[in-house]
Amino acid sequence: MNRRTVLGSALIGAAAATAGSASAQSAPKPKGKTGPRNLITDVAGIRVGQAHDANARTGVSVILAEVPAIAAVDVRGGGPAGRETDVLKAENLVQEVDAIVLSGGSVYGLASADGIAAWMGMRGRGYGMGGAAGVPPSPIVPAACIYDLANGGDKQWGMDPPYRTLAVQALESASDSFTLGTAGAGYGAQAGGLKGGTGSASAVTADGWTVGAIVAVNSVGATIAPGSRQFWAAPFEIDAEFGGLGSAELSAAHEDWGDAKFNPRPRENTTIAVVATDVALTRVECQRMAIMAQDGLSRAVRPAHAPFDGDTVFVLSTGKITIDDPAQRNIAVSRLGNIAADVLARAIARGVYEATAYDGSATGTWKSLS
């Protein structure tokens, strides 16, 4: 074989390899698998109920653990509104919660957890020190709220804000299915310059573990790229769950925040979420998962964790699946945390994608964009 033949063979081989590589790069990448509902309720032991007041433009979402669940929380925003978050610190006594409430109403919305606690205590559910006769239990009901007081709804409620009543209505309607978009805690939300809402998503691993998230999206930051309809969460989308526009042209200059709320001025905000898994985790492991899940906010919202936000993520472990090998636990927590971030990013995009305008609202929806 002469030199020319050898060179020609090498070029043909290189061209074939390049073509194969290009073909591999252009081939559709495998996507993850969602649960049957693509909701947080795909996690065994979790139900969700929602209620809203259309006149006040506000609402409540209750995430119910069918039996008390191990929980943790991570707070990153500069202006949070929360209840019982200190209870969830790893050094404290109580490990399990009965429910978590996401609510509109800012400080007024914190009363939503009062309604849940009273409802549960009356039925004998909650933390107790021996259950002495006549001593009610103490239901553990952490809560976080978004600021939706300036969205044009009637907030002249005087001494009777609606949140306690809305929370009980939500709890009593808790089920496996619930509405996304303009519903529940996200009813009165605004995400950047678009109508925000309640979003949810889930993922199932090859091992059969399930991770789900529910979120009220009321961010100061934008969920779409500047000059685009593409969601920042697009790289993580499964089965066109929020429009299927892809991520090929996602880009932005570092000072271009697009449709954020900084024009004309920053306004009150907060994105609040609950992530759940059916894998049995300790409080410390739930805490690590919550920390990692916050990355989902950064993947889906730009900017995130701003001084004007109150970004808060709770994690629940329902303990249906156990991992007995100690050597595998840290790996499992790492996997769960990464999946949680992706699922939360998807849930954020779904909340905005599914949002609809209420009558008289000046805030455009994602679906109204041309």
Model-based region annotation:
Residues 1-13:
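N-terminal secretory signal peptides and thylakoid transit peptides that target proteins
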Residues 6, 116, 167-170:
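Hydrophobic side chains in well-ordered alpha-helices of soluble proteins
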Residues 17-21:
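C-terminal segment of classical bacterial N-terminal signal peptides
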Residues 22-26:
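Boundary at the C-terminal end of the N-terminal hydrophobic targeting segment
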Residues 29-107, 122-370:
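A structural signal for small-residue-enriched, beta-sheet-centric alpha/beta enzyme cores
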Residues 113-114, 228:
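Short amphipathic alpha-helical segments
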Residues 114-121:
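Active-site-adjacent structural elements in enzyme catalytic domains
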